[in-house]
Amino acid sequence: SKGAIPPHLPESNEQNLIVIEAFLEAAKRYARGGYDVIVDGIVGPWFLEPWLNIVQEHYEVHYIVLRASKEETMKRAIERSKLDRETNIELVETMWKQFSNLGIYELNVIDTTTHSIKDTVSAVKEKIASGTALLYCELDGRKSHNVVV
Protein backbone atom coordinates (compact mmCIF):
# COMPACT_ATOMS: atom_id res chain seq x y z
CA SER A 1 0.00 0.00 0.00
CA LYS A 2 1.28 3.44 -0.91
CA GLY A 3 1.10 6.44 1.36
CA ALA A 4 0.43 10.00 0.30
CA ILE A 5 3.47 12.01 -0.76
CA PRO A 6 3.22 15.81 -0.55
CA PRO A 7 2.57 16.83 -4.19
CA HIS A 8 5.36 19.40 -4.31
CA LEU A 9 8.12 16.87 -3.68
CA PRO A 10 10.02 15.50 -6.70
CA GLU A 11 9.29 11.91 -5.67
CA SER A 12 5.55 12.59 -5.95
CA ASN A 13 5.59 12.69 -9.77
CA GLU A 14 4.05 9.22 -10.20
CA GLN A 15 1.38 10.04 -7.62
CA ASN A 16 0.67 13.37 -9.33
CA LEU A 17 0.23 11.60 -12.67
CA ILE A 18 -2.27 9.22 -11.04
CA VAL A 19 -4.19 12.22 -9.70
CA ILE A 20 -4.24 13.78 -13.19
CA GLU A 21 -5.46 10.48 -14.67
CA ALA A 22 -8.20 10.26 -12.03
CA PHE A 23 -9.33 13.83 -12.83
CA LEU A 24 -9.23 12.95 -16.49
CA GLU A 25 -11.32 9.79 -16.24
CA ALA A 26 -13.92 11.48 -14.04
CA ALA A 27 -14.06 14.47 -16.40
CA LYS A 28 -14.52 12.20 -19.42
CA ARG A 29 -17.38 10.33 -17.75
CA TYR A 30 -19.22 13.52 -16.84
CA ALA A 31 -18.64 14.92 -20.34
CA ARG A 32 -20.02 11.74 -21.94
CA GLY A 33 -23.06 12.19 -19.70
CA GLY A 34 -23.67 15.58 -21.29
CA TYR A 35 -22.15 17.79 -18.61
CA ASP A 36 -19.66 20.58 -19.15
CA VAL A 37 -16.76 19.88 -16.81
CA ILE A 38 -14.31 22.23 -15.14
CA VAL A 39 -11.22 20.69 -13.56
CA ASP A 40 -9.84 23.06 -10.95
CA GLY A 41 -6.29 22.19 -10.06
CA ILE A 42 -2.66 22.95 -10.69
CA VAL A 43 -2.13 21.62 -14.19
CA GLY A 44 1.06 22.89 -15.73
CA PRO A 45 1.96 22.29 -19.37
CA TRP A 46 4.13 19.39 -18.18
CA PHE A 47 0.86 17.58 -17.28
CA LEU A 48 -0.99 18.32 -20.54
CA GLU A 49 -0.10 15.16 -22.45
CA PRO A 50 -3.06 13.13 -21.08
CA TRP A 51 -5.39 16.03 -21.91
CA LEU A 52 -3.98 16.31 -25.42
CA ASN A 53 -4.57 12.58 -25.80
CA ILE A 54 -8.29 12.90 -25.06
CA VAL A 55 -8.57 15.54 -27.76
CA GLN A 56 -7.84 12.61 -30.11
CA GLU A 57 -10.91 10.92 -28.57
CA HIS A 58 -13.03 13.90 -29.70
CA TYR A 59 -13.23 15.76 -26.40
CA GLU A 60 -13.15 19.54 -26.56
CA VAL A 61 -10.53 20.59 -24.02
CA HIS A 62 -9.94 24.20 -23.02
CA TYR A 63 -6.73 24.88 -21.07
CA ILE A 64 -7.15 28.05 -19.02
CA VAL A 65 -4.58 29.31 -16.54
CA LEU A 66 -5.65 31.80 -13.88
CA ARG A 67 -2.61 33.84 -12.92
CA ALA A 68 -2.24 36.94 -10.78
CA SER A 69 0.88 39.08 -10.39
CA LYS A 70 3.60 37.54 -8.24
CA GLU A 71 2.84 39.96 -5.40
CA GLU A 72 -0.88 39.19 -5.44
CA THR A 73 -0.23 35.46 -5.77
CA MET A 74 2.04 35.54 -2.72
CA LYS A 75 -0.52 37.54 -0.73
CA ARG A 76 -3.36 35.15 -1.57
CA ALA A 77 -1.29 32.04 -0.88
CA ILE A 78 -0.04 33.23 2.49
CA GLU A 79 -3.60 34.10 3.56
CA ARG A 80 -4.84 30.54 2.94
CA SER A 81 -1.79 28.48 3.74
CA LYS A 82 -2.09 25.05 5.29
CA LEU A 83 1.68 24.83 5.56
CA ASP A 84 4.13 26.81 7.65
CA ARG A 85 4.85 30.26 6.22
CA GLU A 86 8.41 29.55 5.07
CA THR A 87 7.49 26.33 3.23
CA ASN A 88 4.46 27.98 1.68
CA ILE A 89 6.48 30.95 0.40
CA GLU A 90 9.06 28.61 -1.11
CA LEU A 91 6.38 26.50 -2.83
CA VAL A 92 4.47 29.48 -4.19
CA GLU A 93 7.66 31.07 -5.51
CA THR A 94 8.54 27.79 -7.24
CA MET A 95 5.08 27.52 -8.78
CA TRP A 96 5.16 31.18 -9.79
CA LYS A 97 8.39 30.55 -11.74
CA GLN A 98 6.84 27.48 -13.39
CA PHE A 99 3.75 29.41 -14.51
CA SER A 100 5.28 32.86 -15.16
CA ASN A 101 6.15 32.11 -18.78
CA LEU A 102 4.07 29.38 -20.39
CA GLY A 103 5.43 29.84 -23.90
CA ILE A 104 2.81 28.75 -26.42
CA TYR A 105 0.22 28.65 -23.62
CA GLU A 106 0.56 32.33 -22.65
CA LEU A 107 -2.60 33.03 -24.67
CA ASN A 108 -4.42 30.65 -22.31
CA VAL A 109 -3.68 32.87 -19.29
CA ILE A 110 -6.25 35.11 -17.62
CA ASP A 111 -4.62 37.77 -15.43
CA THR A 112 -6.71 37.74 -12.24
CA THR A 113 -4.61 40.26 -10.31
CA THR A 114 -7.45 42.77 -10.00
CA HIS A 115 -10.37 40.42 -10.71
CA SER A 116 -13.15 39.65 -8.28
CA ILE A 117 -14.48 36.10 -8.32
CA LYS A 118 -17.33 37.31 -10.53
CA ASP A 119 -14.88 38.97 -12.95
CA THR A 120 -12.81 35.79 -13.09
CA VAL A 121 -15.86 33.63 -13.83
CA SER A 122 -16.87 36.04 -16.61
CA ALA A 123 -13.37 35.95 -18.10
CA VAL A 124 -13.34 32.14 -18.05
CA LYS A 125 -16.75 31.99 -19.74
CA GLU A 126 -15.56 34.46 -22.37
CA LYS A 127 -12.39 32.45 -23.03
CA ILE A 128 -14.44 29.26 -23.44
CA ALA A 129 -16.97 30.94 -25.74
CA SER A 130 -14.23 32.42 -27.91
CA GLY A 131 -12.41 29.08 -28.23
CA THR A 132 -9.05 30.79 -27.70
CA ALA A 133 -7.91 28.28 -25.08
CA LEU A 134 -8.76 25.09 -26.96
CA LEU A 135 -6.17 22.34 -27.04
CA TYR A 136 -5.78 20.76 -30.46
CA CYS A 137 -4.40 17.49 -31.62
CA GLU A 138 -2.39 17.53 -34.82
CA LEU A 139 -4.10 14.31 -35.95
CA ASP A 140 -7.72 15.29 -35.51
CA GLY A 141 -9.35 18.60 -34.62
CA ARG A 142 -12.90 17.21 -34.22
CA LYS A 143 -14.52 17.70 -30.84
CA SER A 144 -17.74 16.64 -29.19
CA HIS A 145 -17.45 16.73 -25.37
CA ASN A 146 -16.48 19.84 -23.38
CA VAL A 147 -13.80 19.73 -20.64
CA VAL A 148 -12.10 22.79 -19.17
CA VAL A 149 -8.76 22.26 -17.41
PLM region spans:
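Conserved phosphate-donor/acceptor-positioning beta-strand/loop module used by diverse small-molecule
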Residues: 57-77, 110
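Short catalytic-loop micro-motif centered on adjacent basic/acidic residues
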Residues: 37-40, 109-111
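Loop/turn-to-beta-strand initiation segments
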Residues: 33-39, 62
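Small-molecule kinase domains that catalyze NTP-dependent phosphoryl transfer to phosphate-bearing small molecules
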Residues: 79-123, 132-149
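Conserved substrate/cofactor phosphate-moiety recognition/catalytic segment
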Residues: 1-22
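Short, electropositive alpha-helical surface patch
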Residues: 46-63, 125
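Short strand-turn motif at the edge of the Rossmann-like AdoMet-binding core
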Residues: 41-42, 68
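Conserved ATPase "switch" residues in P-loop NTPase domains
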Residues: 27, 31-32
